[in-house]
Amino acid sequence: MEKEIEIIVPFYDLDPMHVVWHGNYVKYMERGRCALLADCSMTYENMEKHGYAFPVVTMRVKYVKPAMFGQKIIVRTVHVPDENFLIFKYEILDAATRSKLCVAETKQMAIDIKTHESCFQLPEPFLTTFGGTK
């Protein structure tokens, strides 16, 4: 599964050096991930209805080139099949040239909302939707 979304960098995402503040790339990745999850009817609201939360447990980010105010960017989100975690890879690209601005990966673990216990394998229906071989 993969999804691409477009974002035009707003002024309020810039830092004092006039480039996108590094933490806002995480926000862009979240928007991409939510769009991909919505495509497979697994929004965070649906996850909660099934009794699970999926906090991010690891995140790796590599900043390649800064995004600028008004720049049209693409957030490409790719799901990596796994039986234990929700794993997503991201590329943030310049929309005009497709040059890489940022690459990243997140890993999310299922947590039972009632007991707050970690699940070391994806529970159903998440295993059917997101599991599989790497």
Place the predicted regions along the sequence by residue.
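Hot-dog-fold acyl-thioester-processing enzymes
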Residues: 1-56, 111-134
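HotDog/MaoC-like acyl-thioester-processing domains
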Residues: 3-5, 68-69, 80-134
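Hydrophobic beta-strand-centered segment that forms part of the acyl-chain substrate-binding groove
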Residues: 36-87
